[in-house]
From Swiss-Prot:
Upper classification of the organism: Bacteria, Pseudomonadati, Pseudomonadota, Gammaproteobacteria, Pseudomonadales
Organism: Pseudomonas fluorescens (strain SBW25)
Protein name, per record: NADH-quinone oxidoreductase subunit B
Gene name as annotated: nuoB
Known cofactor(s): [4Fe-4S] cluster
EC number, UniProt record: 7.1.1.-
Membrane topology of this protein: Peripheral membrane protein
């Protein structure tokens, strides 16, 4: 599996975001996994256990921008029970949150505030873009709406829909957990170059393309 290695670039200008450089590398542990004797650091062996704890204890930051936030909060109710995935502990401060959900329309005036909140979150941190407006601006192709939050934030998971159902948000959370389980990052909080390895996760559209092309009998609107 290929990984995206992100390193902080200290010589980058201050107005560049994200401040860092990326390159595609192979799994740093792949060469050692199939050997009888493992020659490496103990922290590399513990990465799997630590990632398991991280992905099953994700604390979301409680804020929303528009109607998609209503669908997000619905996932916390009893019928959907987001506590099954360990993400029911909503935090009111970004300093205590693990991931941020951009749920709704992101206006240009709101973009610097969202970026400031993201910068206040401690590593490790992740971002879920929920809904068409957050993904690409949605129906608002106008000057006042940012055409996708990935213009100024590193997005880990995109959840399509206008608005997405709570089940779609839960599926996006599961995809984020899968991605976190394959990450390689330091086991402690450090300042500076962290050398974070993120797995290259193919999109669901690419994974299900052959299955959808093979469909010959389309359902009528009455059967949907």
């Amino acid at each position: 599996m290929q990984y995206n290695l992100t390193r902080i670039d200290p010589d980058a200008p201050n107005d560049q975001y994200p401040i860092g450089e990326r390159e595609t590398v192979s799994d740093p542990l792949e060469d050692q996994v199939h050997k009888n004797i493992y020659m490496g650091k103990l922290e590399d062996v513990l990465s799997g256990a630590v990632n398991w704890g991280r992905k099953n204890s994700l604390w979301p930051y409680n804020f929303g921008l528009s109607c998609c936030y209503v669908e997000m909060t619905t996932a916390f109710t009893a019928p959907h029970d987001i506590a099954r995935f360990g993400a029911e502990v909503i935090r009111a401060s970004p300093r205590q949150a693990d991931f941020m959900v951009i749920a709704g329309t992101c206006f240009i005036k709101m973009a610097p505030i969202i970026q400031r909140l993201y910068e206040q979150m401690l590593e490790p941190k992740w971002v879920i873009s929920m809904g068409s407006c957050a993904n690409s601006g949605g129906m608002y192709d106008i000057y006042s709406v940012v055409q996708g939050v990935d213009k100024f934030l590193p997005v880990d998971v995109y959840v399509p829909g206008c608005p997405p159902r709570p089940e779609a948000f839960l599926q996006g959370l599961m995809l984020l957990q899968e991605s976190i389980g394959k990450e390689r990052r330091p086991l402690s909080w450090v300042v500076g170059d962290q050398g974070v390895y993120r797995a290259e996760m193919p999109s669901q559209k690419e994974q299900r393309r052959e299955q959808r092309i093979a469909v010959t009998n389309l359902r009528s609107p009455d059967e949907v």
